[in-house]
Structure formats: C-alpha cells, structure tokens
Amino acid sequence: MSYRESSGSFPAPDRTSLPKMFTNGDSRLRHLPPISSPPPPKRYKSESTPGSDAGHSRYYSHSVASDRTRSRQPSSAMDLYTLIDRDPVDKDPRRNARFTSNGSVATQASHASNASQISRSSPIIISDRKIPEKYPNHKENGRMYHGYRKGIYPLPCDEEEQDRLDIFHKLFTVARAEDGLIYAPHPPGSRILDLGCGTGIWSIEVANKFPGSFVVGVDLAPIQPTNTPKNCDFYAPFDFEAPWTMGEDSWDIIHMQMGCGSVASWPSLYRRVFQHLKPGGWFEQVEIDFRPRVEDKDGEPGRAMANWYSTLKHATEATMRPLAHSSNETIRNLQEAGFTEIDHQIVGLPMNPWHPDSHEQKVARWYNLAISESVQPMCLAPFSRVLSWTREQIDRIAFDVKQEAFDKRIKTYNLLHIYQARKPVEE
C-alpha cells in the first residue's frame, strides 16, 4: 500500500491506523492548499455557486426553474437543472417516461430500441417492485416519511428532503476532482446500478453523459422523475437489503452514495454487490464521515456540533443502522467480500468558507448549504424515536449547530470518502 502525501493544511491521518490490506490500490488524502499558495486552476465545468456571500447559507440566492420532467412540483429551493449543468439536448422535457407510476415491471422488450447500443447480459427482474399506493407515506414530526418498510430509513422523503439530496449531489460534483460523477473505469455500453438512488439525479446525469450505457436506479421511496433518458430506468419501492433478483454477474458498475445510516450489515451488502458484478466490474461508494474535525491543532469543534454528532452516533447505533463511518472497516469488509484493487480517496469538506483558496471556498459554500439543510432532518427521527426528544429540543440543538457552522472562526470540516473496488477477472 502506498500513501501519497502532499503539503497542505489538513492533518495527515495516523499511518498506524491506515489499512494495510490493499491488493493494488492506495489511500490518499487530498489536502487543502497551503494558505500562501495561489488558487488552483479551474477544474470543473460547472461554475454555478450558491451565492458569493461566504459565511451564511441563508443569504444564498436560489433560482427556481420550472422542470416538467420531475415527478414533483417545483419547490422553494433548488431545481434539478439549476443544481447541475446539462447539455441543451438533455433538457428536452418531451422524453418518454421510463418509470411507470402503477408499479409494473419494465420488460426486456421495452428497451428493444436501444438493444443495438446497450449490452444487457441478463433481464432485470425486481422482486420488491410494488404498487406505491399500497404503502402510503406517513407524517411524523411535521415531515413525510416512506411507507414501504416503514421505519427502517431515518430520513424523510418529502420535497425538502429531495432538495437536500440534490444539493449533496451538486456538492459531490464540485468537491470531487476532474470527473465529478464517477471515478471507476467503465467500458462503453456498461450496465450501471445505482443503489439508494434518491431523486435519481446521479443516475440521470450518468445516463446523459454516457448514452451508450444502461443505468438503473433503485430506492425505497418512489420519488424519481417520470420522464428520464431512454437509457435510464427507476424501480421503487425497492429495499436493497432484501434479496435481489437482478441478475448475478451482470453489472459493470454498482454505485452507492451516502448509505451510512441506512444499512444494517455492510458485509452482507458488499457480498451481494460482489455477486451481482461482472468479473472485472467495479463498485464505487461515496460516504461522508460527519465526525467534526478542526483545522487548528489546538482548536476544538463547536460544542453544539460535537454534541449533535455524538448523540446522533449513539441514537443510530441503537437502531442497528449506524451513521458513523469507518474507512478501516469499509476496506476490510470490501476485502473480505472478495474485492481487489481497492482505491480510497479522502477529500476535505470545510464547514464554511474560512479558507482563502477560491476553490475550497466554493466547496465550502455548497457544504455549508448542504449541512445547514441536513442537521435537523438527520436527527429528527433518531432523536425522537430512540431518545424520546421533543420537537423543541431537536430544533434547539439544530439551531445551535447551524450557528456554529456559519461561524468562520470555527474552522471545522468533515471528510468525504470515495472508494472503488474491483471484482477480480476470472482466469
């Protein structure tokens, strides 16, 4: 294993704690540029930023674009197409719908027009595919939650939550170097599975960027768009912890983003992912470690932020779906599942724009917006269900955490972890 170290202000991890089980991969921490260094060159196609006022997300200006391709009404926050730049050809709202609202399973014949361009080694049969009306959403603490497999996922599925997920998607595309959508190698005509696809924004972006590929997104909540690219389908409600019937050895890429807090057994999930990948296929996982860290050696995270995280960690552990993320455990579990060529990247996410570097300020503005929209919904169900907190108690701690997140004197950051793991090629 090799560890690439560069000059920067983020502290390097303890070498003794770094995993030593890589077959052909490496772990590298992407540091913030030194304070004295000039800003890095522009690396991203999308230069839209949520306002130029660095420090408080409530001052960010949001444009609301009408988008007829979405299954939900335009909201007061960000719209699908204002969050991510798209080619003009992909903005046509007249695409044929690929997601059927009555829950019927798409058949092999429904994709016949794409058969010459997209390789499908086996049919897709989703055993968990049900009629959404059988599982009505339920209201709890003023928010709407999924009805299918009620209670196993701690976050809402309403308009506010959908906007929050889209904001995180934009954050990841900005924070990740070069190609912000996917790092794992993928051949032309790849079959790509997106686990816990949420609003479907990642699946749609990948389908548009790689029109020769075939992308399938699955999720507990049927909140995906009704009109999608022809090479993209969604199946919901679907519980990826339940048995799959989606064809073993049949996917080139399986992707998962922000799964912590929704998985009871990571070893079991990784084994299932391994079974369904083609030999030589790749699994890519993106997670945030929400444990607050500080830039200054002698500094400490804000008390409210530290208390919020430790309490949330305890509450989610009690539900058997912990939010806390461990890179060492993740890499060990991937190896034990059979993966090789494991690669691990670590990216710093400043909580607010305290760093003078222009790119890091851009990342920080998006993360400040994302975290300010996340503090309350992330703890609402765990604190009320597990700890019996009142709504007033939850709102108070959420308010205090947001105040600390907006304070540039507290140089707090979290870590974004990106993994790629390969299923060995059969000899």
Swiss-Prot record:
Q: Where is the composition biased (Basic and acidic residues)?
A: 84-95
Q: Residue spans with biased composition (Low complexity)?
A: 116-126
- What keywords appear on the UniProt entry? Methyltransferase, Nucleus, S-adenosyl-L-methionine, Sporulation, Transcription, Transcription regulation, Transferase
The residues the entry assigns to the signal sequence are none
Q: Which domain of life is it from?
A: Eukaryota
Chief location of this protein? nucleus
Q: Output the InterPro entries linked to this UniProt entry.
A: SAM-dependent_MTases_sf
Polar residues bias: start-end ranges: 98-115
Note down the stretches annotated as region Disordered.
Answer: 1-126
What's the family? Belongs to the methyltransferase superfamily. LaeA methyltransferase family.
Tell me the function of this protein: Methyltransferase that performs automethylation. No other methyl-accepting substrate has been identified yet. Component of the velvet transcription factor complex that acts as a global regulator for secondary metabolite gene expression. Controls the expression of the penicillin gene cluster. Controls benzylpenicillin production, but is not involved in the biosynthesis of the alkaloid roquefortine C. Positively controls the expression of the class V chitinase chiB1. Positively controls the expression of the transcription factor atfA. Also regulates asexual differentiation.
What interactions and quaternary structure are annotated?
Component of the heterotrimeric velvet complex composed of laeA, veA and velB; VeA acting as a bridging protein between laeA and velB. Interacts with velA.
Q: What is this protein called?
A: Secondary metabolism regulator laeA
